[in-house]
Amino acid sequence: MKKNHLVKYLLISPSLPVGGFCYSEGLESYLKIKNLEEPDHIRNLITNELKIGQIRIEAKCLIEFFDIFVELKIANNINKNRRRLLSLDKWLLSFRDTVEIRDQQTQMAKSLFELTKEFGFEYLYEKNKNISWSLAWSWACFSFQINKLEMIENFIYAWTANQLSAAIRLIPMGSIKAQTIQLELLDLISEVSQEIVDSNINDLYVGNISLSMAQQNHNDLYTKLFRN
């Protein structure tokens, strides 16, 4: 694909339906429980998630999916790799503790698959299954020939921007402050991305379960955020 180094911006553009999602993934409940109301609290929360949170597992799975797509493209062990693809995706979705969170993932994945199909890259593997956002993102990057490091960096950047976008609606924080925090996190995003690329998936762990537990109250957030 021509100019594939620019195509990646389609995935994180807030002007597109895929980039326009603003789910907070339990952030509202977490802030309420912890009584966090300052922008610095949001920065610290995101920093902790990047260092020891679930986002690291999801990002690493991007590479695992990517490698499977490479194998499938060259028709290497097709049945085995398709089973591996489905198994890994089901395992990843199981990390999502509520129906709302899982629905969020599969809805976003469906939209991204529709986008890649418009570009001539229809997803052909288990496309009738509930599929995670991470798998869809990996498929898009594989199709657009985006390298693995950029894939991880863009994924984490987009996740961070999404959390900040949700935070603007939840606490007294303007968009300029949110952009400032995003800028301050760039070095960490780059560092974490390289670490994930270099790591083995079996060596990663989730050490911060607070945000995951807050997802248990996601239903209230789901209605409030979209009503606004």
Swiss-Prot record:
Positions in coiled-coil regions: none
Alphabetical list of InterPro entries matching this protein: UreF, UreF_sf
Entry keyword set: Chaperone, Cytoplasm, Nickel insertion
Gene Ontology, cellular component aspect: cytoplasm
Keyword match NADP: no
Compartments, record wording: Cytoplasm
Description of how the protein assembles with itself and partners: UreD, UreF and UreG form a complex that acts as a GTP-hydrolysis-dependent molecular chaperone, activating the urease apoprotein by helping to assemble the nickel containing metallocenter of UreC. The UreE protein probably delivers the nickel.
Its job: Required for maturation of urease via the functional incorporation of the urease nickel metallocenter.
Organism this protein belongs to: Prochlorococcus marinus subsp. pastoris (strain CCMP1986 / NIES-2087 / MED4)
Pfam families associated with the record: UreF (PF01730)
Protein name in the entry: Urease accessory protein UreF
